[in-house]
């Protein structure tokens, strides 16, 4: 049995972020890839939807300028022949403030001929924003 496309993509993505080695990653991303990271775009401009390999590689370059990945744990994963879904926990450092950040995310990826054709990443943004701001978010009290 051959290695699932998710494993190759995951390794190449982390090398692209931490070591700025995008060559391996470029070969694993389809020219017409459909990419979206759901979260507060005003705070994190690299969130949002992108289309095409060049746009995705630019987003990854922007992410690499802002964070370093220290650790990631797959909490659960489901693999199909050309798809993958996973819940993950990441330990990162925000490079501008040298600040540790922990976050959870869910990702849903589709592959064709071993290349990423679509990915959706949903981030626990409430927790992420609190960590980025360095304080809890004050919510209005709900009166019943």
Task: Set out the residue ranges of the language-model regions.
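Short, low-complexity N-terminal intrinsically disordered segments enriched in polar/charged residues
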Residues: 1-31, 137-144
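A beta-strand edge to alpha-helix "cap/lid" segment located at domain peripheries
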Residues: 1-5, 64-144
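Short, well-ordered alpha-helical segments
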Residues: 7, 54-57, 103
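Hydrophobic pocket/interface hotspot
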Residues: 13, 25, 33, 52, ...
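A solvent-exposed, acidic/Ser-Thr-rich amphipathic alpha-helical stretch
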Residues: 24, 30-81
């Amino acid at each position: 049995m051959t290695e699932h496309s998710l494993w190759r993509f995951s390794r190449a993505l982390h090398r692209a972020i931490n070591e700025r080695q995008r060559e391996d990653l470029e070969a694993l991303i389809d020219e017409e890839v459909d990419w979206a990271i759901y979260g507060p775009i005003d705070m994190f401009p690299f969130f949002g939807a992108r289309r095409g390999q060049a746009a995705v590689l630019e987003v990854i370059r922007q992410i690499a300028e802002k964070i370093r990945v220290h650790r990631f744990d797959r909490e659960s994963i489901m693999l199909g022949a050309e798809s993958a879904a996973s819940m993950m926990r990441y330990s990162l450092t925000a490079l501008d403030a040298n600040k540790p950040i922990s976050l959870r995310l869910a990702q849903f990826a589709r592959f064709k001929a071993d290349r990423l054709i679509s990915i959706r990443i949903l981030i626990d943004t409430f927790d992420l924003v609190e960590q980025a701001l360095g304080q809890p978010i004050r919510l209005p009290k709900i009166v019943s």
